[in-house]
Design a protein with these regions (language model features):
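C-terminal domain/tail detector
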Residues: 1-551
Length: 551
């Protein structure tokens, strides 16, 4: 006794006025009416198609999982943003098409009639032959659309994973070209489910004609047209290798290229040389050749091969940067930390001044930092190299680039190719408080002597190599005859310490005002510089620091 018969019998009993049947139905009356209204909003063919799809769950085997079809090396090569999209219902496979969908075609009309009856749309449904043909056409179109979209979503969700090292990528490439061949497996399962089979040559003309007319063959032929570009990659033609074979050959070249770097005595040095050759000399290499090939391939193979190429470039750059980091730490970061970082002006609270010799060696043009930049980092930064991992992160970190820009400002302010270390500036007297009659500003032996009267400007330099000893001092002499009072500093950075002891105001491009308060009096100067950045503000130095890592 079928469920459908029970439903029909219960309906007949209610129609005949059976009180027991009516009372048992009453609790379901409103929910059923509500469900009928909601379902009736959907097109009839969509309702019937969903019913057919639901029934398939009870008669077809378990869903097809692309992860299982690709095999045990899936995670070594692929990644998936949404594993649910890797699951294909058996209803939408070759097996489901041949063993279920095409065999339900005669029942589609009956399902449509039942749908109308269940929704109480009509008491008696009769369909003409034209109606039957239209029902079959609509449901077939829905099936083809669903089938195509599901397989496209599954293949689109198969992406090449990220690789952290050359060793990881070479291992994956070995699986791709000679191991489990996960790329070919993925394309093969797609082809097997979207392409009609090849007829035996033993078939007679009549048998072939009958086979061509079979519903499953016609549906698979339509699907074959939808996925023709993808399936063409596996097609073998006479006297011509398949697209997949050509891809394998190119990936083999890429694998050899990476393996040569990996097996070099110093892999990082070899990787750095490879990057320099490719960028500095526009050298063509297997990475370039593979990327060019990827552009000619159909999806999804173009995406997969392109991604393998991007990852190859990524791991080579990472290897090169890691190699550079060792030299960076030893040749750049170590001398900076040992000789400059903890001393004034880089540490404004330090009582110890940084050596001018150490400062010059480190920051001058072609000095320690500039030489490392020119020989190693410039190529990466000028070419704006990124990791190609979806986030478009640059290979050399942004904070490192920012510090290099700060170093260039220091170089521009304090160094010239003609004179080496040194900067020139002008000090203009502005005002002296009324309780003081004279001020004397001594900057490394360069005097700016001012008494109440007309203002003037003195041109000065730092450091003052014409005088031994480094003392900078401001002295104010009062009107009452008391002893002069001063603030003073000594050392190679004494000028900077003295300006730092004043109150900086009115800071603009090329000039700033500084006010000194001494013994109840005050003297104000305006300092003019040749550069937009104020060399005496201290910010350039105190904000400068170097990380041990570049990447």
């Amino acid at each position: 006794m079928t469920t459908r018969w029970l439903i029909l019998n219960w309906h007949a009993e209610r129609q005949a006025g059976d009180g027991d049947a009516i009372s048992r139905w009453t609790p379901y009356d409103k929910p059923v009416v509500s469900a009928q209204k909601e379902l009736s909003k959907l097109p009839v063919y969509q309702r019937v198609y969903q019913s057919l799809k639901t029934r398939a769950l009870g008669v077809l085997p378990a869903d097809l999982n692309l992860r299982d079809q690709v095999g045990p090396t899936f995670d070594q090569v692929f990644t998936s943003a949404d594993d649910n999209k890797l699951v294909v219902p058996q209803f939408l496979t070759r097996y489901g098409l041949q063993s279920y969908f095409v065999k339900q075609r005669d029942e589609l009309v009956e399902l449509t009639a039942m749908d109308s009856w269940v929704l109480n749309l009509t008491r008696s449904v009769k369909y003409s032959d034209a109606d039957r043909a239209e029902i079959q056409r609509q449901l077939t179109e829905q099936y083809i659309s669903d089938y195509t979209a599901t397989w496209r979503a599954g293949m689109d969700n198969l992406n090449i994973r990220n690789f952290e090292s050359i060793g990881q990528l070479t291992g994956a490439l070995e699986q791709v070209i000679s191991g489990d061949q996960p790329l070919q497996r993925a394309l093969t399962v797609l082809r097997d489910n979207t392409q009609p089979g090849v007829f035996s040559e033993k078939l007679s003309a009549k048998e072939r004609e009958e086979a061509l007319a079979e519903p499953d063959y016609q549906l698979l032929t339509r699907l074959g047209h939808e996925f023709a570009p993808e399936n063409s990659t596996l097609a073998v033609q006479k006297d011509k290798e398949s697209t997949m074979q050509a891809v394998y050959q190119q990936l083999t070249e890429l694998h050899r290229y990476l393996l040569a770097i990996q097996n070099a005595p110093v892999p990082g040095k070899s990787a750095l040389k490879a990057v320099q050759l490719r960028l500095d000399q526009n050298s063509s290499d297997p990475i370039f050749a593979t990327r060019q090939m990827a552009k000619t391939l159909p999806a999804p193979l173009n995406r997969w091969v392109g991604r393998l190429t991007d990852q190859a470039w990524h791991v080579v750059m990472v290897e090169a940067v890691h190699y550079m980091e060792v030299d960076w730490r030893d040749s750049v970061v170590k001398p900076f930390n040992e000789q400059l970082a903890n001393n004034y002006p880089f540490n404004p609270r330090s009582a110890q001044d940084a050596s001018l010799d150490a400062f010059e060696r480190f920051f001058k043009p072609d000095g320690i930092l500039d030489t490392f930049y020119q020989q190693n980092l410039k190529l990466f930064i000028d070419n704006d190299l990124s990791l190609e991992d979806g986030d478009n992160n640059v290979i050399i970190r942004e904070d490192i680039i920012a510090q290099l820009e700060t170093a260039q400002k220091i170089r521009d302010i304090f160094f010239s190719k003609q004179n080496g270390l040194g900067t020139s500036f002008a000090v203009e007297t502005v005002s002296l408080s009324g309780n003081k009659r004279r001020s004397v500003l001594n900057l490394d032996g360069q005097l700016v002597d001012y008494s109440q009267g007309r203002n003037y400007t003195a041109h000065l330099v730092w450091p003052n190599n014409m005088r031994e000893g480094n003392e900078s001092k401001l002295t104010l002499i009062g009107t009452s005859g008391n002893a002069p009072r001063s603030i003073s500093f000594s050392g190679p950075w004494a000028q900077f310490r003295l300006f730092g002891a004043g109150q900086l105001t009115g800071v603009q491009d090329g000039n700033f005002t500084v006010r000194f308060s001494v013994d109840g009096g005050a003297m104000t100067y305006r300092v003019h510089t040749d550069t937009e950045d104020n060399p005496f503000s201290g910010g350039l130095f105190s904000q400068f620091g170097l990380s041990d890592t570049l990447y």
